[in-house]
């Protein structure tokens, strides 16, 4: 599984639909792409049980709901450990996006950070703080977030911390990894191999670095990752599982070829 030298990947043609015959371009995302990346994510997850629980008033305050997604995309992109990619149709429309982070303190992780350059790292650090302050002030001026169930958001964050420590933090050997922070694809473009092409980007990097890939799979996304060779480490906490489809989704891991797996898959 690989991308062409110019970053393009063509879907197999099909006489049934014009969508399936369009050439798809996978490219590195820029900060200008963040708004559309956010809108794609907001649309993809709009009707999921988790979204309905966290943002019950998203229909009434749709602009705020979209802004959550856009701000998150930008915040991730301003981290020097992050790499973001978009999938575009032949017309240039962003139809999907993926964001990955190179975690750890190993030589490979620091080599990548150094390659970014000191000036760019300083710019990203300053921009991240300015953006954080801007977001705080803007939400304050609007009288706070009207889309959220604040108690649900705090509860969900606590579940994430528990699972993060259980599956990643308590396993020193998993600290050095690429982590898939987000993968979204518009519904009408799903099932055409585009998600695999986006994941191919990080799988090639992980194979080159000799490190694992970790991610949190939704109930719907678990099938894709399984086909790509990811293994399930464990389901989300019982409470989180009750919000999503019970018994589906969870923490998943991918091992590069030749990687010495852990002696135990204990969760």
Residue ranges of each PLM-predicted region?
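A short beta-loop-alpha structural element at the N-terminal edge
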Residues: 25-39
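Active-site rim helix/loop that mediates acceptor-substrate recognition in acyltransferases
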Residues: 56-84, 89, 163-169
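Conserved beta-hairpin
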Residues: 80-100, 184-186
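Conserved acyl-donor/pantetheine-binding loop and adjacent beta-alpha core of acyl/acetyltransferases
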Residues: 99-184, 190, 239-246, 258-265
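Conserved GNAT acetyl-CoA-binding A-motif
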Residues: 176-178, 206-217
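Conserved acetyl-CoA-binding loop-helix of GNAT-fold acetyltransferases
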Residues: 185, 191-204
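Conserved active-site alpha-helix within GNAT-family acetyltransferase domains
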Residues: 196, 208-210, 219-236
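Conserved catalytic-core motifs of GNAT/GCN5-like acyltransferases
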Residues: 231-251
């Amino acid at each position: 599984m690989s991308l062409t030298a110019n970053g393009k990947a063509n879907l197999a043609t099909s006489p049934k639909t014009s969508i399936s015959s369009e050439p798809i371009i996978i490219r590195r995302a820029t900060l200008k792409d963040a708004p559309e990346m956010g809108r794609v994510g907001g649309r993809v997850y709009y009707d999921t049980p988790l979204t309905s629980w966290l943002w019950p008033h998203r229909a009434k305050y749709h602009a705020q709901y979209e802004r959550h997604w856009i701000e998150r995309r930008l915040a991730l992109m301003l981290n020097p450990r992050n790499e973001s990619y978009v999938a575009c149709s032949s017309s240039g429309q962003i139809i999907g996006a993926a964001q990955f982070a190179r975690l750890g303190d190993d030589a490979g992780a620091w080599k990548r950070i150094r390659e970014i350059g000191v000036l760019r790292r300083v710019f990203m650090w300053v921009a991240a703080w300015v953006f954080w302050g801007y977001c705080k002030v803007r939400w304050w001026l609007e009288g706070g977030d009207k889309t959220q169930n604040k108690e649900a958001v705090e509860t969900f964050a606590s579940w994430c911390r528990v699972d993060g420590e259980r599956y990643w933090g308590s396993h020193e050997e998993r600290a050095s990894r690429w982590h898939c922070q987000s993968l979204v694809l518009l519904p009408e473009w799903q099932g055409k191999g585009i998600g695999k092409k986006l994941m191919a980007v990080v799988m090639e990097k992980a194979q080159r670095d000799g490190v694992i890939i970790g991610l949190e799979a939704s109930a719907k996304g678990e099938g894709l990752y399984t086909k790509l060779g990811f293994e399930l480490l464990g389901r989300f906490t019982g409470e989180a599982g009750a919000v999503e489809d019970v018994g589906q989704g969870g923490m998943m891991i991918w091992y590069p070829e030749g990687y010495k797996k852990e002696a135990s898959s204990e969760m």
